[in-house]
Amino acid sequence: MSLAKPAMRGLLGKRLRFHLPIAFTLSLVAALGFKYGVTEPRKQAYADFYKQYDAVKDFNAMREAGIFESVRPSGE
C-alpha cells in the first residue's frame, strides 16, 4: 500500500478558480463599504456645513480679530 501521488498538473489553475472569485467579491465589498461608510457621510457633512456657512460673516469676524495683515479692522 503506497501513498497516492500528488496532483502536479493544473495546481495554479485550480487555486485561481477557487480564490479569484473570492478576491473579487471581497474587494467589491470593501470598496462599497468604504464608499457608503466613509465617503457618503463625509460628503453629507460637508453639504450640511456649507448650507449654513456664511463666508462674509466669518471674514468679518477674522478681520475684527486682527488676523489679516492686509485688511485693517473696521475700528481703525
Swiss-Prot record:
Positions in the Mitochondrial matrix compartment: 2-10
Biological source species: Thunnus obesus (Bigeye tuna)
Residue intervals passing through the bilayer: 11-51
Positions on the Mitochondrial intermembrane side per record topology: 52-76
Domain of life (superkingdom): Eukaryota
Localization: Mitochondrion inner membrane
Assembly behavior: Component of the cytochrome c oxidase (complex IV, CIV), a multisubunit enzyme composed of 14 subunits. The complex is composed of a catalytic core of 3 subunits MT-CO1, MT-CO2 and MT-CO3, encoded in the mitochondrial DNA, and 11 supernumerary subunits COX4I, COX5A, COX5B, COX6A, COX6B, COX6C, COX7A, COX7B, COX7C, COX8 and NDUFA4, which are encoded in the nuclear genome.
GO BP annotations listed: oxidative phosphorylation
PANTHER family linked to this entry: CYTOCHROME C OXIDASE SUBUNIT 6C (PTHR48416:SF1)
Protein's UniProt name: Cytochrome c oxidase subunit 6C-1
Entry membrane topology: Single-pass membrane protein
Keyword field contains Mitochondrion: yes
InterPro entries documented for this protein: Cytochrome_c_oxidase_VIc, Cytochrome_c_oxidase_VIc/VIIs, Cytochrome_c_oxidase_VIc_sf
Keywords, comma-separated and alphabetical: Membrane, Mitochondrion, Mitochondrion inner membrane, Transmembrane, Transmembrane helix
